[in-house]
């Protein structure tokens, strides 16, 4: 079996990005990020999603290393966000007979983004395409985290191609499968990815989890991060917990401070909570903290304390920015305290 072969006839052809510093120009990438794409090879060949176009040359090399001169029959587009779709025009030039498969919203976006409206095939909920011995079935997952999102399932191998669902920040360090990688940092990066990218859409994520719960799944192929096989239960559990907005016991103290007074207050609160036996306390100075880590931990823990001085008669700007991001993500079910110091 070739190194890229996840299962018989299913290959990884994705790429690592270790140069982009901020995902969506917002969220830091200390460990990089992967853009994952997969070939399913049978009597016919399907490619599941593409990669960021700036890595297109490497992507095409990965495909040709496996297919040689064999054509791609189908390109399945589970997600139209440009980090997964911007290589479509290149592929259409290289494989002009390739049929592009997507749902109605996908095909509208395909035309709007790239002017492609020929050799397309619309699929609906539960429909399948036969590749020979392997079949691909399609299930809609709208607003996880874009309106056109769907997932693709191969029942013969019990593989779910999950688009951005179950994804994580972090490039792949040599391996592809979870069994080949050190996963220590991926768990926090998964929570950070969910909180920043998917966090607003807990209800749609729950609907998708319920819809897919009846499928036997032994491999999850997301568009970001490792291919999951050994840790599927933990991965689904994290997404389930986060999308229910169920925090673990713990406290996030986030503050802004101009002259040290709010900082002193935050430290005293943290110490007193410790005296009272509270565990898992994290204190963030919002003028220095990576905001994506703060949002991650607000999703992770069940209590949030925010301290702010006033600034021009309003909240300190960094505190106001955090509260806006919390509001955007509709985070319910939290114990919350806000303290203002008028200085």
Task: State each model region's role.
Residues 48-50, 73-80, 100-103, 160-163, ...:
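Active-site neighborhood of phospho(di)ester-bond hydrolases with catalytic His/Asp-centered motifs
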């Amino acid at each position: 079996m070739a190194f890229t072969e996840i299962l018989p006839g299913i290959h990884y052809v994705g790429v690592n990005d270790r140069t982009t510093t901020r995902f969506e120009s917002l969220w830091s990438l200390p460990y990089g990020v992967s853009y994952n794409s997969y070939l399913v090879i049978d009597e016919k060949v399907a490619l599941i999603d593409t990669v960021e176009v700036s890595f297109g040359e490497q992507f095409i090399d990965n495909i040709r290393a496996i297919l040689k001169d064999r054509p791609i029959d189908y390109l399945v587009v589970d997600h139209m966000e440009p980090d997964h779709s911007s290589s479509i025009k290149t592929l259409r030039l290289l494989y002009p007979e390739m049929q592009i498969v997507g749902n109605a919203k996908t095909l509208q976006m395909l035309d709007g983004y790239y002017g492609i409206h020929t050799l397309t095939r619309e699929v609906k909920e539960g429909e399948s395409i036969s590749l020979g011995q392997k079949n691909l079935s399609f299930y809609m997952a709208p607003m996880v985290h874009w309106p056109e999102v769907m997932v693709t399932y191969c029942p013969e191998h019990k593989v779910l191609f999950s688009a951005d669902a179950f994804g994580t920040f972090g490039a792949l360090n040599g391996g592809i499968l979870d069994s080949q990688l050190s996963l220590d940092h991926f768990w926090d990066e998964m929570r950070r990815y969910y909180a920043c990218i998917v966090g607003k859409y807990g209800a749609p994520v729950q609907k998708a989890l319920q819809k897919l719960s009846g499928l036997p799944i032994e491999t999850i192929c997301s568009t970001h991060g490792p291919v999951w096989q050994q840790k599927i239960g933990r991965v689904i559990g994290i997404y389930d917990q986060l999308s229910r907005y169920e925090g673990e016991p713990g406290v996030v103290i986030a503050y802004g401070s101009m002259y040290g007074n709010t900082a002193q207050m935050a430290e005293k609160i943290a110490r007193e909570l410790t005296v009272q036996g509270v565990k898992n306390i994290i204190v963030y100075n919002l003028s220095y903290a990576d905001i994506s880590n703060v949002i991650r931990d607000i999703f992770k823990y069940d209590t949030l304390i925010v301290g702010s001085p006033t600034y021009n008669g309003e909240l300190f700007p960094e505190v106001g920015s955090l509260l806006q991001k919390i509001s955007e993500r509709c985070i319910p079910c939290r114990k919350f305290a806000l303290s203002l110091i008028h200085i």
